């Protein structure tokens, strides 16, 4: 256990930040899974639901990047994978 005051403060700060980052990551994972399920069940009548869920995931990813829970490249990669999944689903639905 740390003895000097600055080390004790750093332990408290890092634990607080770890919990905050974990919350952001958990929310992004949950929303991403929900969005991918919506994309898998894509039909013409629920396209607006898919668009709203994707915009919600994009918003949460951007907030997580802004707060430092994700590296900017990680956030961009997650958004690109969602966009690619939607694009493939739309192409397969049309064909």
From Swiss-Prot:
Cellular component, GO annotation: chloroplast; small ribosomal subunit
Keyword Ligase found: no
Biological process according to GO: translation
Any Pfam family the entry gives: Ribosomal_S20p
Disulfide bonds: none
GO MF assignments: small ribosomal subunit rRNA binding; structural constituent of ribosome
Record's subcellular location: Plastid, Chloroplast
UniProt keyword annotation of Repressor present: no
Identification of the protein by name: Small ribosomal subunit protein bS20c
Organism: Pyropia yezoensis (Susabi-nori)
